[in-house]
From Swiss-Prot:
InterPro entries: HCP/CODH, Hydroxylam_reduct, Prismane-like_a/b-sand, Prismane-like_sf, Prismane_a-bundle. This is Hydroxylamine reductase. It catalyses: A + NH4(+) + H2O = hydroxylamine + AH2 + H(+). It is found in: Cytoplasm. Hybrid [4Fe-2O-2S] cluster binds at residues 243, 267, 311, 403, 431, 456, 491, 493. CDD domains: HCP. Keywords: 4Fe-4S, Cytoplasm, Iron, Iron-sulfur, Metal-binding, Oxidoreductase. The gene is hcp.
Length: 549
């Protein structure tokens, strides 16, 4: 069986995975993801018509949000889960059509196939999936723009899901997801119209990150400067990875007083910066590094492991039986924690009971790392920052947000951080931080040279900080600030962050370690000519370029 996927930075040969995903997903899972997307496009077409009639169904919006999230890189590898999602999607789509008719609407005679096709067996799903994948769009520029839009929607959906878990939603974001998905079925749209939609996705990218920022800070307080322990204690423990702060809250409540410690991994590290989580004495610290090192770090952790969102790597047998997934995450043979019931906490008792029987983590490092520099914290020391710029103590800021990954070429970011002049400050968010957040880079007048705002969605904080600095310095354009953007990308959340920055007018962003394989030469040219998007070269040449040497 063949497949085609080029949504992540590590895609085979930089052009696409065709036999098995570099991420580990099989061809049948990749194809079922394509089919689920196809069904959701049909749902979106019907949803747009329903909305015109005043019909807004939260169950439909939630399904599309979670369905998009489930197809993100390293989220779900479970064939059976996707078969079930396709069936659920078809049923929802048809019930939505019934609502339209009941409300007096007339279904168009020429509905796109995605809004009418139906089947029930896994065999029929397999046959259809082979016909509706990425390569079904023959024009490479149209294909490139459609996929760029879809990947932006996937990132948007991930952030919307985190906000939704905390009780925050925005109907306009859901409506745009539907508009965007439906647009990818419309062969009448020109390249210019698709480019406009991609940029509109950036607008909603800003909105969804602002919504999630509000959800997180209202629920847990504003992140504050925090020292995070990276050593271990001698108690049984649970390692929580992913991004879902509501899951962390539920887990901390349920483990309190049990003798089980809780550690974060990967993108969950910034949870330590939120005031609400500091009251838990058993919330010990952060264990390990970025997602791609989990094959070794999950092994040495010894305890139970909970994956709340991506990034999951196909697990080794040595820890598979102590791994749990929840939410959109899934892997065949790995225990899954069901969704929380309305008004209740998610039941993590199975994770906790297993953890009690397991040995304490093996120590892999000691010390502390510092973070918590989201917009509110930076504004609290804004006078200090502004004075440092005016005095010349700080010559330039470098936004190095984004993702980490397996490729050896990503060592560039470690060396780049080391090579930056001492009068520069790195602003970061996302797991890209692990390339340099444990280096001794010092400080400038008490301001650490690495300011970590948080998770990848906290790139929003970096944008807010830039806009505030523009205002403070009385500039007309954010690009007049002494800020350079050298961003590492890996998956689709980085795509929506990029589109959000473009919407905010940020230009001359450098993207690496490679440019996306889903950008056709012509689409890449549009981004280069209109926004100054560029790749990376060597550390020395890039530092000189950014510093104007």
């Amino acid at each position: 069986m063949s497949m085609f996927c080029f949504q992540c930075q590590e895609t085979a040969k930089g052009t696409g995975c065709t036999i098995k995903g570099v991420c580990g997903k099989t061809a049948d899972v990749a194809n079922l993801q394509d089919l689920l997307l196809y069904v959701m496009k049909g749902i979106a077409i019907n949803s747009l018509q329903a909305r015109e009639l005043g019909i807004v169904r939260q169950d439909v919006d939630k399904f599309v949000m979670e369905g998009l999230f489930a197809t993100i890189t390293n989220a779900n590898f479970d064939n059976a889960r996707f078969v079930a999602l396709v069936r659920e999607g078809l049923a929802l789509r048809d019930s939505l059509k019934a609502d339209i008719v009941k409300a007096g609407g007339v279904l168009p005679a020429n509905l796109h196939d995605s809004a009418t096709w139906t089947a029930d067996s896994a065999e029929e799903f397999e046959q259809k999936a082979a016909q509706v994948g990425i390569l079904a769009t023959e024009n490479e520029d149209v294909r490139s723009l459609r996929e760029l839009l879809i990947y932006g929607l996937k990132g948007m959906a991930a952030y919307a899901e985190h906000a939704f878990a905390l009780g925050y939603e925005d109907n306009s974001i859901f409506a745009f997801m539907m508009k965007g998905l439906a647009a990818t079925t419309d062969d009448s749209l020109s390249a210019d119209q698709l480019v406009a939609l991609v940029l509109e996705a950036g607008k909603y990218g800003v909105d969804v990150m602002a919504l999630l920022d509000k959800a997180n800070t209202t629920s847990y307080g504003n992140p504050e400067i925090t020292k995070v322990n990276i050593g271990v204690r001698n108690n049984p423990a649970i390692l929580i990875s992913g991004h879902d702060l509501r899951d962390l809250e539920d887990l901390l409540k349920q483990t309190e007083g049990t003798g089980v410690d809780v550690y974060t991994h990967g993108e969950m590290l910034p949870a330590h910066y939120y005031p609400a989580f500091k009251k838990y004495a058993h919330f010990v610290g952060n264990y390990g590094n970025a997602w791609w090192k989990q094959d070794k770090e999950f092994d040495s952790f010894n305890g139970a492991i909970l994956l709340t969102t991506n990034c999951l790597v196909p697990p080794k047998d040595s820890y598979k039986d102590r791994l749990f997934t929840t939410s959109v995450v899934g892997y065949e043979g790995v225990k899954h924690i069901p969704a929380r019931e309305a008004g209740k906490v998610k039941d993590f008792s199975a994770v906790i009971e297993l953890a009690k029987t397991l040995p304490a983590p093996t120590e892999i490092e000691t010390g502390e790392i510092v973070g918590g520099f989201a917009h509110n914290q930076v504004f609290a020391v804004a006078d200090k920052v502004v004075e440092a710029v005016k005095s010349g103590a700080v010559k330039r800021f470098f936004v190095m947000a984004g993702c980490d990954g397996r490729m050896k070429s990503r060592d560039y970011y470690t060396e780049f951080a080391k090579a930056l002049p001492q009068d520069t400050i790195i602003l970061t968010a996302g797991c890209a931080k692990y390339k340099y957040n444990k280096l001794a880079l010092g400080d400038i007048g008490g301001i650490p040279r690495v300011l970590d705002a948080g998770q990848c969605n906290d790139s929003y904080s970096l944008a807010v900080i830039a806009l505030k600095l523009k205002e403070v310095f009385g500039l007309d354009d954010v690009n007049q600030l002494p800020i350079s953007y050298n961003i590492a990308w890996y998956e689709q959340k980085a795509v929506i962050v990029l589109l959000a920055l473009l919407y905010l007018g940020v230009k001359n962003i450098h993207l690496g370690p490679t440019l996306p394989g889903f950008l056709s030469p012509n689409v890449a040219k549009v981004l280069v000519e209109n926004f100054g998007i560029a790749g990376i070269t060597t550390v020395e040449d890039d530092v000189n370029l950014f510093m104007g040497a």
